Amino acid sequence: LGGKGANLAEMNLIGIPVPPGFTITTDVCTEYNTLGRDKVVELLKDEVVKAIAHVEALMKSKFGDVENPLLVSVRSGARASMPGMMDTILNLGLNDEVVEGIIRKTGNARFAWDSYRRFVQMYGDVVLGMKPTNKEDIDPFEAIIEEVKKAKGVELDNELKVEDLQELVKKFKAAVKEQTGKDFPTCAYEQLWGAICAVFDSWMNERAILYRKMEGIPDEWGTAVN
């Protein structure tokens, strides 16, 4: 189950209220690295859909629904602690329609659009490979944020208004299209599979491999996905 998954399961068993969820085990990571993405997604598909349905029932909301949306986080969880070495995606399930559902539920447009722009940025970095690989590279999302703040005459992110955050989302998605040649995914399940695979991929990223060598952590252990 990995560290996060095991601890969450244990807290749940002793009655501590934790958000509902599920864990894809470290064994699947090993299979992923052996069989490849397409085969593992095919093998996992039905189980993940059933697990999401269980979370939907507990949360009384629907993944990808525009009226009563369920958002999820997707996190790594190795057996040994590897802080900051692997990847996380938050607010997954958002798109242009779902964000309006969040506004209707919360009554807070700024919260909804800020969550959305953070999700697009995080997904672009982690799943779509737009994160800079060294200090010399410019982060396209951070560059856009600075450009918009300058145009609006503000210095801090939290000074941006709802319409500014909407502009950020639009510009972020245009940057995704320009850099990847593809539109930002709007289907919740397409987003989910991208995130699951990105977490498995992060087990073999350069910084994680180096950290494991330094700490004596075997490559074969793999990471869980929560």
Predicted regions and their residues:
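Nucleotide/phosphate-binding sheet-loop regions of phosphoryl- and nucleotidyl-transfer enzymes
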Residues: 1-226
